[in-house]
């Protein structure tokens, strides 16, 4: 028997969307002076909430607040997309401030030969601070600013906060700020090309474990968490390409550590994302230096992304330092310092920003890019789009000039629609009778499922996509109510209008800018504004300067998460668990 943890059971719980199956454990109290004189047993009793002690122990009626660590989340199969409820205390704006005040930051300077070197390494607590920011975060903050503030201008305001004198660098114990603030769009463009090659068998695909068709997007951590914990049969379908957050983290950690000759843990990477579940993604063992450590330099479990904060937490970060975020200048604070490698610098800080294409949606455009890649390979082909039961389910077909179907794909956003998707992918149960038909075959004949005919499905947990992520600023947040002068609590109509503002900000690139991406040249062949050849050359250069195989840098893996809750454990395992909790979880 194990108690089920829910909001009703705890007065300090943070209201998750689903019940967590971790049992509420109460650690044994420290023995008093009289008890300490008595022989001690090696047995300990874990008292579940609502249960009475089986021994003669007494309770004073007060129990410490229940705590659930990130380790608990990764070890059980209870929660799906409510990771924010248990991760706020582990990755937050307070952690950013704590690290910034821990020691003077490492500095990258030029030696007498003009080569980049790091100063300040004599202090073991010193870090080199670098941040990456998602376009959805910039869109959310731009909408909160109002006054036709663009996504790019909101990005400059974030740079002012993270690295400018009017922000974090203007105060604190050591006056530390972030050395670089990069745009995850550059990593996203690499992910788009890698994902298309994975689906269509293009030149960059080098993975040994190609996913099973239909290939499903894996850049949404809420969706991946749900699949690993509740529907492991879909794991062979998940794309092996890292998410933009993960790829950017690997790029920054590997390049800076290998080129500058410092340990990966001396580089501290902050990601600013629209989703609380990105905190969970950053904590995956597969996304640490254990996955890419090579060449006699084994990994030690150092995260590629050390901390994730959301769009909301950017405002909290500014407020905690007494900075009015909305009063920051809407221009770049300073020119970004030169990255230690010139080719990587050109990739991270392109001369021109590529405008977001509306046809690509608000979640990065994975499906749109793949379809454009298919169209580029078949002259005269065209797209046929069919809307599903709601706006978050759309099916696409690429038809040849003769009307023959060349490629089929779909988009599934929102948890309810995802449930329908995984239900269609569920394999039929084998019959226990010799020669009998598999269970479910009468209801779902083989080959009749439209979803199984798709080559690719773009899956996102949030309805409407990533601009509607759980970490985004919402219309009923006090900052929006104040800035919008709402007389009463916003309703569904205001929520819809607010989401439209965020989406509009996401697509608010300069109309005069060409649809070009990092390093694109007019002479290069472009797909959805991206040059695949330039991306491939950049990735090859990255692997070369770090001495790490490209497969280890750009691909990841997934595994079924099996719950141990309710299963018998040995005394040794129980003591180890208790010791871990007494020591603080992490």
Swiss-Prot record:
It comes from the Eukaryota. One of its GO terms (biological process) is iron-sulfur cluster assembly. One of its GO terms (molecular function) is metal ion binding. The keyword 4Fe-4S applies. Keywords: 4Fe-4S, Iron, Iron-sulfur, Metal-binding. [4Fe-4S] cluster 2 binds at residues 220, 275, 462, 466. [4Fe-4S] cluster 1 binds at residues 20, 73, 76, 79. It holds the Pfam family Fe_hyd_lg_C. Belongs to the NARF family. Component of the cytosolic Fe/S protein assembly machinery. Required for maturation of extramitochondrial Fe/S proteins. May play a role in the transfer of pre-assembled Fe/S clusters to target apoproteins. This is Cytosolic Fe-S cluster assembly factor NAR1. The gene is NAR1.
